[in-house]
Swiss-Prot record:
Induction (free text): Up-regulated on CD4+ T cells upon stimulation via T cell receptor plus costimulation via CD28. Up-regulated by IL15 on immunoregulatory NCAM1/CD56-bright NK cells.
Gene Ontology MF term list: activating MHC class I receptor activity; kinase binding; MHC class I protein complex binding; MHC class I receptor activity; MHC class Ib receptor activity; signaling receptor binding
Alphabetized UniProt keyword annotations: Adaptive immunity, Angiogenesis, Cell membrane, Disulfide bond, Glycoprotein, GPI-anchor, Immunity, Immunoglobulin domain, Innate immunity, Lipoprotein, Membrane, Receptor, Secreted, Signal
Identification of the protein by name: CD160 antigen
Expressed in which tissues: Expression is restricted to functional NK and cytotoxic T lymphocytes. Expressed in viral-specific effector memory and terminally differentiated effector memory CD8+ T cells. Expressed in memory and activated CD4+ T cell subsets (at protein level). Expressed at high levels in intraepithelial lymphocytes (at protein level). Expressed in both alpha-beta and gamma-delta CD8+ T cell subsets (at protein level). Expressed in umbilical vein endothelial cells (at protein level). Expressed in monocytes and at lower levels in B cells.
Lipid modification (GPI-anchor amidated serine), residues: S159
Glycosylation sites: N28, N137
Organism: Homo sapiens (Human)
One GO term describing the cellular component: side of membrane
Amino acid sequence: MLLEPGRGCCALAILLAIVDIQSGGCINITSSASQEGTRLNLICTVWHKKEEAEGFVVFLCKDRSGDCSPETSLKQLRLKRDPGIDGVGEISSQLMFTISQVTPLHSGTYQCCARSQKSGIRLQGHFFSILFTETGNYTVTGLKQRQHLEFSHNEGTLSSGFLQEKVWVMLVTSLVALQAL
C-alpha cells in the first residue's frame, strides 16, 4: 500500500534533508587545469572538514592506472589541521603541479588521488589526459580548463562518488521501506 500523499511528501522531505546533511560532510576530490602563458598547472583539490585534514595525503600520478600511490606520484601534499580556522564546515586543500613548458614527454594519463592514513579512506579522481600534438600544441581532455585559479565545490570534475552512491542507496532503501509501511 502506498503512503498517504501528505505522509509521503513529509517522509521524502525528511530523507532529502538527511541526504543533504550527509553529502555535505563527504570528502571529495576534483581535478582542474589552468594555463598561464606557456605554463600548465594541474590542480588536485580535496574538499574536507578541517578535522579530517590530519593524516591525509593528496597526490598526482601519471600513467599509473592501477598503482597510483604517494610513492609512485609526481607530487604529493600532506595535509595538516589548521587550528586557526574556526566555524568552517568544509574547506579545500590544493596540490598544484606546474609544467613550465609542455613537451611530448608530458603526454599521458594523469589522476588526482588522496589517502587518509588514519581512517583508511582512499579517493581516486577521474583520469584526464595531456596530448602533445605535432604542431607543438597540446590538449587536455577529461576535465575543465581554467584561465585563473578559482575553485568552488560545484565546479571541476567531481570524482569521489563512492560516498554519494552510499547516500543514494540509503535514500532508495528508505523510500522502499516507507512504502512497505
